[in-house]
């Protein structure tokens, strides 16, 4: 069998601990060839829209993502070709003109709330994970992130959670759990599940003639 990268999809609600799980797996393979690809960098470019209209963007809906662009980049990485990863500007609510050069690696971790929603993405994955965390923990984590990293107010985060995030989670994110090979409760705190994942990834790497 020829050399082929391993693609791991990590999904779950906003604030579920996906990033913690991703980093835990990444740390286990730090000495190897591994990269992280975040779905939320692939929100659609909205530079053609007035700023006031961009403010109404529903970032928790599947249509907010440019999955065609993400799939194009994944296929490039799977062919061991480099990509120019986009950067999303949450203050301007559109894609930045800047990009990041990313070289291909043997392990690709694709992380995002809806990475399991699109069948085309699922078909590119070797392992599909869903991080399952209680709603109260998810809202607290989302509040802290949006206030610290995205310049949001507490009131705006709470209002958005009630009117958008929660209904979108119930309608689109939670149902993707059924596509997961493994469901990880307690996010990054679940060391047993993460250790099992690391072992499984090592097995696939060996089968793909990488390790």
Swiss-Prot record:
- Which controlled-vocabulary keywords does the entry list? ATP-binding, Cytoplasm, Kinase, Nucleotide-binding, Transferase
- GO CC terms in record: cytoplasm
Q: Which HAMAP family match?
A: Uridine_kinase
Does the keyword Nuclease belong to this entry? no
Which residues lie in coiled coils? none
The subcellular localization recorded is: Cytoplasm
Q: Name one GO biological process term.
A: UMP salvage
The GO molecular function terms of this record are: ATP binding; cytidine kinase activity; uridine kinase activity
Record's protein name? Uridine kinase
Could you tell me which InterPro entries the record lists for this protein? P-loop_NTPase, PRK/URK, Uridine_kinase, Uridine_kinase-like
Which pathway does it operate in?
Pyrimidine metabolism; CTP biosynthesis via salvage pathway; CTP from cytidine: step 1/3; Pyrimidine metabolism; UMP biosynthesis via salvage pathway; UMP from uridine: step 1/1
Instruction: Please list the reactions this protein catalyses.
Output: uridine + ATP = UMP + ADP + H(+); cytidine + ATP = CMP + ADP + H(+)
Known EC number: 2.7.1.48
Please give the family membership noted in the entry: Belongs to the uridine kinase family.
Say which enzyme class the record assigns: transferase
Protein source organism: Bacillus licheniformis (strain ATCC 14580 / DSM 13 / JCM 2505 / CCUG 7422 / NBRC 12200 / NCIMB 9375 / NCTC 10341 / NRRL NRS-1264 / Gibson 46)
Cite the binding residues for ATP: 12-19
